[in-house]
């Protein structure tokens, strides 16, 4: 992984991905005790940053392999990103999704033209299912985070943050990233290392699923023992990736951990003050900025809202939580 791959991904994505801005609200600033800058990837195509990695991975593939079709496993956002990217490249797509994924994510993935295969998150391995179907059908597997071209695509978020930070005069700030397996976090970290080295990347995770935060403290990969138990489904993973982990270990600061209650409150704040729809996992970084303010340094903080694919009932719960 290197910055040249991320710059190449930016060229492929140009004209296809939404170039999201940095947004600010004085109301959020008051809660956080500093200026809060929000990178709203909930406004990205398919409702999350995952479109970037999916499209870049398909664009970079060998044309013959791409024509044979692709397969991915995902709780929903990578699923939708790959499904739309496959449709845009006129190829077939199979998505392996947990049966407890939000209904909206499952229905949207099907609407993009993908074949959806459901599995039991608590008792089955999506990796094993994906590898088996890939071999049986001759499909190319696009992993959700531990895939170089996927990381490169996600890293384009970091290039844009660096550009906008310069415009706004932000030279010293924590950049808090919603973190599951680390594809977005490591991609942003690589981009900022090259283009804005004074900005510090910090992962945000739900409590009891903070494998990256624990890994950073321990200096080695730590695993989560549970596979379910948080509303932040989009960022629940077993452990950091083999590719993403060494990047995060080298470039990331101390991890931040938030509760489900804080995630819902952040969803409500994003809607009230920025008119943004965030899903629970996508609001984790904002929750850390607002409710873990004593763990953050500097007069500015930049956060990703990484996704907005939330079921209406969950969103209503969030709005009622304040």
Give the ranges of each region predicted by the language model.
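PLP-dependent amino-acid enzyme catalytic core
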Residues: 1-322
């Amino acid at each position: 992984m290197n910055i040249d791959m991320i710059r190449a991904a930016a060229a492929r994505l140009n004209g296809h991905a939404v170039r999201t801005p940095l947004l600010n609200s004085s109301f959020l600033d008051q809660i956080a005790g500093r200026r809060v800058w929000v990178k709203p990837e909930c406004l990205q195509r398919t409702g999350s940053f995952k479109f970037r990695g999916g499209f870049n991975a398909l664009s970079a593939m060998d044309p013959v392999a791409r024509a044979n079709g692709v397969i991915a496993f995902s709780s929903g956002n990578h699923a939708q990103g790959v499904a739309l990217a496959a449709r845009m490249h006129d190829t077939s797509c199979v998505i392996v999704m947990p049966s407890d994924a939000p209904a909206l994510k499952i229905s949207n993935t099907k609407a993009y033209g993908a074949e959806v295969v459901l599995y039991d998150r608590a008792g089955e391995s999506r990796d094993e299912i994906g590898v088996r179907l890939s071999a049986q059908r001759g499909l190319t597997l696009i992993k959700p985070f531990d895939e170089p071209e996927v990381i490169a695509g996600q890293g384009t978020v970091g290039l844009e943050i660096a550009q906008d930070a310069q415009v706004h005069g932000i030279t010293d700030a924590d950049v808090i990233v919603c973190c599951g397996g680390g594809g977005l976090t490591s991609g942003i970290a690589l981009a900022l290392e090259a283009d804005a080295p004074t900005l510090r990347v910090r992962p945000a995770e739900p409590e009891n699923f903070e494998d990256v935060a624990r890994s950073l403290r321990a200096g080695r990969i730590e695993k989560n023992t549970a596979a379910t138990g948080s509303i932040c489904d989009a960022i629940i993973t077993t452990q950091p990736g083999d590719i993403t982990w060494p990047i995060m270990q080298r470039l990331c600061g101390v991890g931040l951990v938030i509760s489900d209650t804080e995630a819902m409150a952040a969803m409500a704040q994003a809607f009230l003050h920025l008119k943004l729809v965030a899903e629970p996992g996508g609001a984790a970084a904002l929750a850390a900025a607002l409710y873990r303010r004593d763990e953050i340094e500097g007069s500015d903080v930049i956060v990703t809202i990484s996704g907005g694919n939330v079921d209406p009932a969950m969103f209503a719960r969030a709005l009622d939580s304040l």
